[in-house]
Amino acid sequence: VVLDPRAATVAMLSEDGVSQMRGKIAHGKANAAIALGMGSRALMNRAEQQAYFIQSVNGLLDGDMVPVPGGVLIRDNDGTLLGAVGISGDTSDNDEAAAVAGIAAAGLSAETG
């Protein structure tokens, strides 16, 4: 899932036979990154330290926040936020690695937290 800086969906891709929940999880990872301005790995760390805060924000986002690795902010070479990528389908660490690789392949900067 690719979101713009407002968290509007720009693109979503999935393979045949994949649960539609994967897209929702990927969206939640990217949405969380946009909402709080940090990659979802940093959000996972914050959730461990401030569970009530993350739970409250998740409520404000109507449950569309998944604070585990795989939601990565996209920045241009000047540091301007372009959006976020969210990936789900493997381990969270591998999801994050795939997002970072895709962003780098586009010549942009990835921010995982």
Which sequence ranges carry the predicted segments?
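Flexible, solvent-exposed loop/hinge segments and secondary-structure transition points
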Residues: 1-113
